[in-house]
Regions:
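Acidic, metal-coordinating catalytic segment for phosphate/diphosphate chemistry
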Residues: 1-26, 31
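Hydrophobic (often cysteine-bearing) scaffold residues that line and stabilize catalytic clefts
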Residues: 20, 61, 65, 153, ...
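Short connector loops at helix/strand junctions that flank enzyme active sites
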Residues: 21, 49-54, 101-103, 125
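Residues embedded in well-ordered beta-strands
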Residues: 25-27, 34-36, 105-106
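Conserved Nudix-box catalytic region and its N-terminal flanking loop in Nudix hydrolases
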Residues: 30-75
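Unchanged
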Residues: 59-82, 92-146
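Conserved S-adenosyl-L-methionine
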Residues: 84-88
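Nudix hydrolase/Nudix homology domain
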Residues: 122-176
Length: 176
């Protein structure tokens, strides 16, 4: 496994990081070569949120990364997927939560979509839809200024896209 990418939280006041979370996240592409992201809009502990982020979440006890990827993609995007490759790990801090998150990123392709999602109550409050766009359009969105937490999330997502592009280049695939 290549070295993890570390992203420091330089937007919220520095604090002691005293808890960890292990997650999976995905770069997901559908049959139309569009990439799926969740549009987040609302308020929570971070304040106002207006950004996009990849599907993913915590790995449950007894679950493998692969199981968690398939569950999260179905729950959040309403898709079944094929895992193409593990593309890297991004470690990022959330000072407000006093948390360091270890996010294992996977490149996945949609098998079947438009299935029912199964969101948590918080997700139902914040998730405002799923967007499917070209990688160029996604990068343009991620490079726009947004709320503090949005900028932190977008920084992580741009690093994940770099991991995806590196994987595609190395493996001779097409990068849309």
């Amino acid at each position: 496994m290549s070295k993890a990418i570390y992203i420091e939280d330089n937007l919220f006041d520095k604090t002691i990081i005293d808890n960890e979370r292990y997650t999976v996240r995905v770069i997901i592409k559908n049959k139309n070569n569009l990439f799926g992201y969740i549009y987040i809009n609302g308020e929570d502990i971070f304040g106002y949120r207006d950004h996009i982020e990849s599907a993913g979440g915590g790995i449950e006890e007894g679950e493998t990364d692969e199981d968690a990827v398939k569950r999260e993609v179905l729950e959040e995007l309403g898709c079944t997927c094929k895992i193409v490759a593990f593309i890297g790990q991004i470690v990022h801090d959330f000072n407000l939560l006093r948390r360091r998150t270890y996010a294992n990123y996977y490149y996945v392709e949609v098998i079947d979509e438009n299935l029912e999602t199964n969101l948590t109550s918080l997700e139902k409050t914040l998730f405002k839809g799923i967007i499917w766009k070209s990688l160029v359009d996604i990068k343009n969105i991620l490079n726009k200024e947004t709320s503090k937490v949005g900028m932190l999330v977008h920084k992580r997502e741009l690093k994940a896209i770099e991991l995806y592009e590196k994987y595609i280049k190395k493996n001779g695939g097409q990068n849309e």
